[in-house]
Design a protein with these regions (language model features):
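Conserved N-terminal Rossmann-fold NAD(P) cofactor-binding segment
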Residues: 6, 31-74, 88, 309, ...
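Conserved glycine-rich cofactor-binding loop
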Residues: 15
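N-terminal Rossmann-fold NAD(P) dinucleotide-binding loop
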Residues: 19-20
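Conserved S-adenosyl-L-methionine
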Residues: 28-34, 137-140
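A structured beta-alpha segment of the ubiquitous adenosine-cofactor-binding alpha/beta core
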Residues: 54-75, 81-90, 96-113
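Rossmann-like NAD(P)(H) cofactor-binding subdomain of soluble oxidoreductases
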Residues: 89-157
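C-terminal substrate-binding/catalytic lobe of Rossmann-fold NAD(P)-dependent dehydrogenases
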Residues: 136-141, 151-330, 334
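Single conserved hydrophobic/aromatic residue that forms the stacking wall/gate
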Residues: 329-331, 335-350
Length: 350
């Protein structure tokens, strides 16, 4: 079986649970024959176990040295931040993990400025992704964050409720921030071909049940901690590798991703939009839902802006007016109007 590429993939945080699962997933998918495992704690144990798995003609290296890890890297996935613990929100990780993101961005700029794509998954991902983008000097289309986990949680919940396969639940999406203020969109969802909007408010699925499901989706990460005693690791690992696979030339990624947004309404922020992610990177359109859904998206954006402004106060990023000094190439890649309708129609069929 051929590899998608022979270019170097660096996995940051590879000694941890998410990182080590990303390594195994990437090897199983045969993404590349050149994988580097990087962590501040030696990931050699992970590398040795992967070698002993017998994946064959793959170069697996492990290092704690940033220069070795990032030099010649063309693709990067980073889970290299502190995980969320019981009782914590993603926002509680803001200062420490954004400082880590600053270092990551600077390492990218110094050692692999020609990297093709970077996926950020450590929380709060919208902000750690933004910080990485700013300090890396990369284009917005080259840096994305994991947001799909919220959409798959909605899909999973609906599939369980209506006793259907997840593949029969289409159009699931959450937009805005990857946190409890996310905007859950149900207006484009179909269950086995039937619009969800025709089911909500019936005895089969009451308004109260739908509201509770949306709340449960926004707290899906906390539920995993409750059930397993630790934060999610298998699902974010798999979805993030699927993201990098899409950029390497695999099937386009079918769920929303976090991307840098620059519109008249939403600006100077990273958040989940209706996106395409493929070999050209990330491109987005602004989702259109019901008035209530759009208002939720506005509120999610405002919440992200408050955290972004806190990063300015903490001196992790400069004032917005000075962002061009550290990354002048921040023009976002929004799809033109002729592609927006096509993109959204295709998403609703996913």
């Amino acid at each position: 079986m051929e590899f998608l590429t022979n270019e170097k993939l660096t996995i940051v945080g590879a000694a941890g649970m998410i990182g080590s699962n990303m390594v195994q997933t990437a090897l199983t998918m045969r993404l590349t024959n050149d994988i580097c495992l990087y962590d501040v704690f030696s990931p050699e144990g992970v590398a040795e176990e992967m070698r002993q798995s017998g994946f064959g003609d793959v170069k697996i290296t492990a290092t704690t040295d940033a220069k070795e890890a990032f030099t010649n890297a063309k693709y990067i996935i980073s889970s290299g931040g502190a995980p969320r613990k019981a009782g914590m929100t993603r926002e509680d990780l803001l200062k420490g993990n954004c400082e880590i993101a600053e270092g990551l961005g600077k390492n990218i700029k110094e050692y692999c400025p020609d990297v093709k794509h970077v996926v950020i998954i450590f929380n709060p991902a919208d902000l750690t992704g933004l910080v990485t983008l700013l300090y890396s000097g990369l284009k917005p289309s080259q840096v994305t964050t994991l947001a799909a986990l919220d959409s798959t949680r909605l899909q999973s919940a609906l599939a369980k409720k209506f006793n259907v396969m997840q593949s029969e639940v289409k159009g699931c999406a959450t937009y805005g921030g990857h946190g409890e203020q996310m905007a859950v969109f149900g207006s484009h969802v179909t269950i086995d071909g039937k619009p969800l909007t025709e089911i909500i408010g019936t005895p089969e699925f009451t308004n109260e049940e739908w509201e509770q499901m949306k709340t449960d989706v926004t707290k899906g990460g906390a539920k995993i901690i409750e059930l397993r005693g630790r934060s999610s690791f298998q699902s974010p690992a798999y979805l993030s590798v699927e993201m990098i696979r899409a950029v390497m030339g695999g099937e386009p990624f079918k769920y929303p991703v976090g991307t840098y947004v620059s519109t008249d309404k939403y600006n100077h922020i990273m958040m989940a939009m209706n996106t395409t992610l493929d070999t050209t990177g990330a491109h987005y359109t602004v989702p259109q839902g019901t008035a209530e859904e759009n208002a939720k998206l506005d509120a999610s954006y405002e919440h992200l802006c408050k955290m972004r402004d806190e990063l300015v106060t903490l001196n992790i990023v400069p004032e917005i007016s000075k962002w061009n000094e550290i990354n002048p190439d921040r023009k976002s890649t929004r799809l033109n109007s002729s592609h927006q309708a096509i993109s959204y129609a295709v998403f609703c069929l996913k």
